Amino acid sequence: MKHTLILLLAFGLFAMTANAQCRSFTKKNCLSSLDGYIQNDNYNSAILIPGDEAELMLTFLAGQDYRLIVCSHPVLGEVSYEINDASGKRLFDSRKNEPDVNHVDFKVETTQQLQIHVQVPDSKSAIMHEGCVTVLVGSKS
């Protein structure tokens, strides 16, 4: 029982440290991309490895201009992302639109939920690097 408690405490501290590292990475490397947009209160970040995928549902309000940013640590390579509506219809694909741009600006006509799907490319390296991937949303009225 004592060993289990120590192990759980160690995992908890590791998770807190990883989250703090992602927050620091986001502040230093991602927030400036919002330029002119007001960041929403959500902080959406994860530590991913090559081959990982993550999905996130976000609500966007009618009549507002938005900037969605997918910012990732360079060690992960060219992270791609898609934006889909609630029915699964693809609205944006970073691989087809502008692969070197980490953000997309848009306006929604009706309040709706959109699904953000992020994919880290596979790596042929024997060493698995992990890195932070952050999805930021900013808005203008």
Name each model-derived stretch.
Residues 14-20:
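Sec/Tat signal peptide C-region and signal peptidase I cleavage site
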Residues 20-37:
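Predominantly extracellular/luminal regions of secreted and cell-surface proteins
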Residues 21-23, 46-129, 138-141:
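Acidic, Ser/Thr/Pro-rich low-complexity intrinsically disordered segments
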